[in-house]
Curated annotation (Swiss-Prot):
Belongs to the papillomaviridae E5 protein family. It comes from European elk papillomavirus (EEPV). This is Protein E5. Keywords: Early protein. InterPro entries: EPV_E5 (IPR012555). It holds the Pfam family EPV_E5.
Length: 43
């Protein structure tokens, strides 16, 4: 019972970590493509 709970928490934390890494990677790729344009706008 306890092992199953730890496994469930581990999988949940793992999925959140993977999602966070994916979003960070997507943001870095987006910033690499459109970052210069945003800087030139000088908002």
């Amino acid at each position: 019972m306890t092992y199953g709970l730890l496994l469930f928490l581990g999988l949940t934390f793992g999925l959140q970590l993977m999602l966070l890494v994916f979003l960070l990677f997507f943001f870095l790729v987006w910033w690499d493509q459109f970052g210069c344009r945003c800087e030139n706008m000088q908002l």
